[in-house]
Design a protein with these regions (language model features):
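Membrane-proximal envelope and lipid/glycan-remodeling enzymes
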Residues: 1-344
Length: 344
């Protein structure tokens, strides 16, 4: 909460506030007394696994591989530890993840443009930078069109798909307009979400060039891709730095992203590139976290790649990397949340 004109305001965007209104109503009715962060995190995790399981139907038939890949985004990545902490920023990332995978499901597997738009609104309502992925969803909604199609065919396809695009946009545009009004009412600017109003935040050294800056890119690259683990003299002999480490070290399964194939390869890599650029420009690469928590919003697009570029049946390399990834993230969860081994 930040002070302003004799009041206190949340620095979370409107979508994030609305996401937890049901919990607030339960507190108001005295059904619960404290914010059930870990219960909400568990609900997000369960629903996300369900949608990942359903999304696998796009390009796979193996039940074993379907189960493994549905579990991987939660238990084989930094989502497990960060979401498991139940903090407000982590819950917002969890809602964004759920919104993205739900939007992909209702776009690609069971086309329901209005529901896809509702989930997309949930996603960018919790992480504003996800608005950058909107053109990718538009592309997925508008396809398919044959490679040899003429401009006439393209215009005909656009007219045919336009109603679906409009249904998709109803809730996101509504939320966007309400968010602009919400920001203006609090801080007299539709673009001011309030983060810069946190006392002394702009005095922190990593924000000297602003909340977002190209100067922040090298540090974010270091944290996201190259930061390693620490060590200690007793079992398990290594421990994790509390301010980030490489997503590929924390989840070796991600090395499989670079295999060839997949029907949605271009769309997925485009979304990953757009979102990663926005994340790398953030002055602070995540603060207290395991691995690179911002990259949680990349996982649904990584999932599309992994589903499409792998074998039809479960392979030994996939099982091996899955086991290693789950072990690393399970250990991280234990060290971060159940022990006092992790220190600044």
């Amino acid at each position: 909460m930040v002070p302003g004109e004799g009041r206190y305001y949340s620095v979370f965007p409107l979508g994030a506030v609305l996401s937890v209104v049901p919990v607030a109503l339960l507190q108001k009715a005295n059904v619960i007394h404290d914010f059930p962060g870990r219960a909400v995190a568990a609900l997000i995790a369960g629903l996300s696994v369900y949608f990942f399981f359903q999304l696998f139907a796009l390009e796979g038939k193996s039940l074993g591989r379907r189960i493994l890949l549905a579990l991987f985004p939660i238990f084989g990545t930094w989502v497990w530890c960060n979401l498991g902490s139940g903090g407000a920023w982590h819950i917002a990332l969890g809602f964004a993840l759920l919104g993205e995978v739900g939007a992909l499901y209702f776009t690609l597997v069971r086309p329901r443009p209005f529901l896809a738009g509702a989930f997309f609104a949930l996603a960018f309502g919790n992480r504003t930078e996800l608005i950058l992925s909107a053109p990718v969803y538009f592309y997925l909604l508008m396809r398919p069109i044959d490679a040899g199609a003429t401009w006439t065919d393209a215009r005909r396809n656009l007219r045919a798909k336009l109603p679906a695009l409009i249904r998709f946009l109803i809730l996101p545009i509504t939320l966007g307009l309400l968010t602009a009004a919400y920001n203006f009412a609090r801080f007299h600017s539709i673009f001011d979400f309030g983060y810069s109003h946190i006392p002394n935040v702009l005095l922190e050294p990593w924000y000297q060039s602003g909340l977002f800056s190209l100067h922040a890119i090298p540090w974010n690259i270091q944290k996201m891709l190259f930061e390693g683990f620490g060590d200690m003299p007793s079992f398990p002999y290594f421990r994790f730095y509390p301010f980030g480490c490489s997503i590929f070290l924390s989840s070796p399964f991600l090395f499989l992203l670079f295999r060839e194939g997949g029907a949605y390869k271009s769309a997925a890599w485009t979304a990953i590139a757009l979102l990663t650029f926005a994340l790398w420009c953030h002055g602070n690469p995540g603060g207290w976290q395991f691995s690179y928590r911002y990259a949680i919003i990349l996982i649904p697009w990584m999932f599309l790649l992994l589903v499409g570029n792998g074998p039809t049946q479960l392979s030994t390399i996939e099982v091996s990397l899955f086991v290693v990834s789950v072990a690393i993230n399970g250990l991280a969860m234990y060290e971060f949340l159940w022990t006092n081994q992790i220190h600044p």
